[in-house]
Structures are given as C-alpha cells and as structure tokens.
Amino acid sequence: MFQGFSQQTNDFLWGIRFNNERSWFEAHKQTYLDQVQAPLRELAQEVYQQFSARHQDLPLMVRVSRIYRDARRLFGRGPYKSHLWFSLRIAGEDWAAHPVLWFEIFPAGYAYGMGIYDAKPATMARFRQDMDQHPQKMGKLARAFQKQDRFHLEGEEYKRPKGHPKPPLDQWYNRKNLDLLCQREIDPLLYSPDLVGEVVEAFEQLLPYYRYFSDLCSRGD
C-alpha cells in the first residue's frame, strides 16, 4: 500500500542528477529500489485500480517508467533518468498520439496531468475544424478550464498561426500538442498516502478533456 514518498526519494533524485554514473547508482541502488521504484509502482497501481474501476469503458493500461535511459538516445547525458513517471494510456505503439494521463516525480517536486505528446497533424487539424464548426463543444471545456486553478495549459504552438478564434478558444487553437498539467514543489502531500486520492481526483477533473481528445484521435484510426 502506498504510504507516500520520502525525503530519501528526493535526495536520491538529486543525487542521480549530479552523479549520473554507474558507480554512484550501484552504491545507492537499494535506496532507489526502496524509496523511489517501490512507492512509484504502488502509487501507479492504486491510482490505476481506483480510476479504472470507475471508468471500465476506457481501455486503459498502466505503465511505470524505468530509470535506465535508452543507450541509443543518450545524446551526451548520463545513463539514468532523474525524472520518473507513470502513465495511464491505451495499448499499442501509437499511444503517444493519443491522450495520456500521467504523474511524474523529479528532484524539486512533482507534477500530474494529461497530455498528447506526439499529436498527429491530422488530429490537430480535426481539432481546429471541430472548433470552427462546433465552437460551443470545446468552448464549454475551455471556459471550465479557465475557471479552475489546479491545471494550466502548455504545448508547442505553430510559428504561423492556423487561425485567430475568439477567447476562450484562442488559447487552444494553434497548438501542435497539448499538456494540461499541475506542477507542485515538494510539500507534505508528496509524503502522504493522500497523494493517491489527489491524483485520482485530478484525473477525474481531466476526464472530459480525455474523452474529447480520445474521440478526436479515434476518428482517424
């Protein structure tokens, strides 16, 4: 059962960031297993079980990241990650082109939200078309997003705007990809079992956006 992360969790993540080499990792591997990997897996499973039990119609699976970087893609970086995460997502190789619910822990804090990280241009074209033809649908979601204070909107924008819709759609229209995220510094919640409930509640808040973008993606499958 998830009991919270600990100061040792963050100490390890800081350590691996500044000592990203095999000898340091091997000397601190038990700390990683006990204070990072184990609680992250526990959190992932409990969030997944609670959320998927409420939404059995969603074809979700849970995946927890490994600390080892792909040796083919180091690009001058060390072999270990200092940011670790889990995700609730669809199965298949094309998962990054669909919305993903996620949680991430890093040395200075943690974050959670929903993103489409490798959105297909055709998906975002359907998104713009949907806003053009049915502005009330996304408009309702955009207004609800403006009224809340848990998440903020991020995502790469086109250098040349695709259009200039009126608020509140203007913040969404010209995105290449999307991330709705809550980012937090280290706080008591991170070290508490209550983190499970917070992440589940956050995913519930994001569910209308998850369903909306899942529908957009499925139209092209």
Where are the predicted features?
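Long, solvent-exposed, polar/charged low-complexity segments
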Residues: 1-15, 19, 44, 51, ...
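Short, hydrophobic/aromatic alpha-helical segments in well-folded domains
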Residues: 11-12, 28-31, 113, 127, ...
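Active-site acidic/histidine clusters and adjacent loop/turn architecture
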Residues: 14-67
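Aromatic- and glycine-enriched beta-alpha-beta binding-site module
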Residues: 72-132
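Compact, glycine/acidic-enriched structural inserts
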Residues: 106-167
